[in-house]
Amino acid sequence: MIGKQATLCDIVLEELVLPIDLHCHEELPELPEELEESVVEEEPEYTPYKIVVYCGGCDTKLKLYILATLSGIRDFQTSLLGPVKLLCPTCREEIRNGRR
């Protein structure tokens, strides 16, 4: 600008914010197979469960509170319905002291 007043020829209009293409053409480097598998594997989701079973010695009601995955709770259920019996503290002491 030359002089005291600006003329149209002296004013240069430019966009202040330049648009950037967000869909750039960059490529990510290839990850080794071991890293790809570890990235794909997610942390298993743990769900809280309340389990009510009866003592294997005196049939007292026992309550268990656990966190388990879906497959873990199914395996635990299979064990409880099969060869595993839980004991209350009283029966545990009796067996421990040789009374049973």
Swiss-Prot record:
Q: Please outline how this chain is modified post-translation.
A: Highly phosphorylated.
Query: What organism does the UniProt record list as the source?
Result: Human papillomavirus 22
The biological processes this protein is annotated with in GO are: DNA-templated transcription; symbiont-mediated perturbation of host cell cycle G1/S transition checkpoint; symbiont-mediated suppression of host innate immune response; symbiont-mediated suppression of host type I interferon-mediated signaling pathway
Motif range (Nuclear export signal): 73-81
Q: Which family does it belong to?
A: Belongs to the papillomaviridae E7 protein family.
Could you tell me where this protein is found in the cell? Host cytoplasm; Host nucleus
Role description:
Plays a role in viral genome replication by driving entry of quiescent cells into the cell cycle. Stimulation of progression from G1 to S phase allows the virus to efficiently use the cellular DNA replicating machinery to achieve viral genome replication. E7 protein has both transforming and trans-activating activities. Induces the disassembly of the E2F1 transcription factor from RB1, with subsequent transcriptional activation of E2F1-regulated S-phase genes. Interferes with host histone deacetylation mediated by HDAC1 and HDAC2, leading to transcription activation.
Provide the GO MF annotations for this entry: DNA binding; DNA-binding transcription factor activity; protein domain specific binding; zinc ion binding
Which segments does the record annotate as unnamed zinc fingers?
A: 55-91
Where is this protein chiefly located? host cell
For this UniProt record, the keywords arranged alphabetically read as follows: Activator, DNA-binding, Early protein, G1/S host cell cycle checkpoint dysregulation by virus, Host cytoplasm, Host nucleus, Host-virus interaction, Inhibition of host innate immune response by virus, Inhibition of host interferon signaling pathway by virus, Interferon antiviral system evasion, Metal-binding, Modulation of host cell cycle by virus, Oncogene, Transcription, Transcription regulation, Viral immunoevasion, Zinc, Zinc-finger
- One Pfam family in the UniProt entry: E7
- InterPro entries from the UniProt entry: Papilloma_E7
Quoted from the entry, the domain comment is: The E7 terminal domain is an intrinsically disordered domain, whose flexibility and conformational transitions confer target adaptability to the oncoprotein. It allows adaptation to a variety of protein targets and exposes the PEST degradation sequence that regulates its turnover in the cell.
Report one GO cellular component: host cell nucleus
- State what protein this is by name: Protein E7
Subunit annotation:
Homodimer. Homooligomer. Interacts with host RB1; this interaction induces dissociation of RB1-E2F1 complex thereby disrupting RB1 activity. Interacts with host EP300; this interaction represses EP300 transcriptional activity. Interacts with protein E2; this interaction inhibits E7 oncogenic activity. Interacts with host TMEM173/STING; this interaction impairs the ability of TMEM173/STING to sense cytosolic DNA and promote the production of type I interferon (IFN-alpha and IFN-beta).
> Which residue ranges are recorded for the region named E7 terminal domain?
1-43
